[in-house]
Amino acid sequence: MSALEHYMYVLECGDGSLYTGYAVDVEARLAAHRAGRGAKYTRSHAPVRLAAQARFFSRARAMSAEALFKRLPRDRKDALLAQAMGEPFEEVLRRELPGFGCDTAEEFVCRSLACSIDVGYRDFMARLMPTVDPSRVVGVRTPVLRAIARELAWRPDAPSYLRALPHRLFEEMQVHAFAIGLERDYDAALALYDRFLPHVDNWATCDQLPVKVLAKGPGRTLQKVGEWLASGYCYTVRFGIGVLMRLYLDERFERRFLDEVAAARLPGAPERPDPESHAYYVDMMRAWYFAEALARQEAAALPYLLARGEGALLDEWTRRKAIQKAIESRRIAPELKARLRQAR
């Protein structure tokens, strides 16, 4: 049983009666019933055995199935349970219960994720994102998440998924991010970014949020970047810096962008941010920006990495991190790397 799954289950009690319930972990719930910690009904009608369980991908769907099943006459319940001996109970219910309906957009996403879980990849990703509770990571690779987002975008109920924030799982947030990247209308995309960014809680979702559509309105996007940099929220600030790095280091570059990124620190940020703090994730992006700017706009960016002491243009921690990233880059000439090493 995974974090994506919700269950409706049916117990047969000692006197032959049936008890129907909802659970995210049927085995644990069954153990509770058998130990007398379940419902009053099962305590007074023990022992119990599991007659069937139906897997769904939203709590609402599982509880709806429970309610619909409870209202059936006993002979109808027995007929459905008999069918469940030869096929998944959820398929029986989906086919036989009136008004059951099709998957919602949320259920489509969760069902799709459940088909592609990689436990090893889950553990790998959880280690890379210390700000995310590991229980919120199920382990689905990025190409699969992009494919799910493309399918989601074609669904008529996709807007309902894009309104349902925040999503519980990291991968649900990733699908949402990639779906935003498929929006071609500039104004619609801006609204989606503004709705989504306050709920981003890790560097991976922030950095993989597509920005291509923002190039359609470079002037308005710059105004929006100014709002994001001034937001005071870690991943909104980080995203704003990322937009400047990805869209404004070519012919759109202006020297003032360097000053804006240099000033884009969180309120009260320490001189040496803790690796698990919000300040760390903003300052690391600032360092990345200056290393990238050095590769693409060397004359303008170099003074920020060389200046120290009273004439410094960057805080010392970010300056050193930017130098480190630049030295590691294959796009920086050896002669310049040597100069940077002397400036550390």
Language model feature labels by segment:
Residues L97-R344:
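Alpha-helical scaffold domains
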Residues M1-F56, A60-K77, L81-F100:
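GIY-YIG nuclease catalytic motif and its immediate N-terminal context
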